[in-house]
Amino acid sequence: MFNWKSKCSTRSLLTTVAGAKSDDSEFESVDAPLEPQTWEGSFLCGLLKNQPQVLPVAAAKQLQELSTQRKDTLIRWEHSIGSPEDILHRRIAEMKEQECQTAIEDIMYTLIVYKFFKIEVPLVPNLSKLISNRRLQIWPPRETELESIHGPEVLGLIREHLTSIIRWVHRNGPKINCSTLRIKRLQFSRIYSASIMYGYFLKSVTTRHRLELILAQSQEFCPPIQFLNAQFNSTQKQEQEEAIGGSTEISSSSKPSSVVDLHDLKSYMMGFDPKTLELCARLRSCEASNLIEKHSWALFRENMKDFLEPDEAVILDPSSLKRLLLEAIAFGSFLWDVEDYVDEIYKLHDS
């Protein structure tokens, strides 16, 4: 349903290569792993296919309409409290809330897919469509495009994450050869979901870091009121001591504090206390949590049979694993942006 239209011609949004070997693989057009469940999602899918340039405006309008519908329903319920229609309007409000949440999640997912569209990277579809004889290969890797959305410091952290994951799979999986990995399907899905969370976490950290740098720079030119008060009290004390012939030395505690040290991102992150670390890692909304679960489920499991066979192993090369992990990290970063944008228009549920 989520299809892609390039600048020059109409193409499938999701074009991947599946097969045991790159030379006998063939391209195929497939849908995104998660299909829309609401009219709003289906409508945006059509725009993404035929008129992607108008999708952001259409999504914003849908968000406004859903916000208005939810408010109107709640107002009718509040007005009916104490009347015979109280229970009816409460039930209507609950149903409307559920409908709106599903529609909001569809809109958020489409906006994430649109962000992948803008960097010309197709989302990997359900892996069952790409696996042949338990072997998965994804080509091209799209490494350059997926890395292009991150700054140099973040990219360094991401590469450390990728290296640690690949080494872990090598160390814990059955030994085949140095260029082939084998991982259980359930483990694979957990690593993918964890990488989405890592991308979300990195986006949260970089945003917080940037804001603190701006604050530190502003304080350098415009000292905070606490510092000005300390300066004033220090001056008063000095004048009093001079008036009675006392010492004119200013205590070290009253001297101007040094400007906040502008750490690099990794040093800044390593300095987090447990509370700050938890705050940055925690998903802000239930909708974001639901999307990660739904997207991962749609990618790794086609039906209940797949879920009941978690020990099924997947064979793949390091480049295919790296492709999926980079996609997951980008998904988490895009999710943070989309969640922040949507929450400004339609208040999401706190997680």
What are these regions (language model features)?
Residues 1-24:
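N-terminal chloroplast transit peptides
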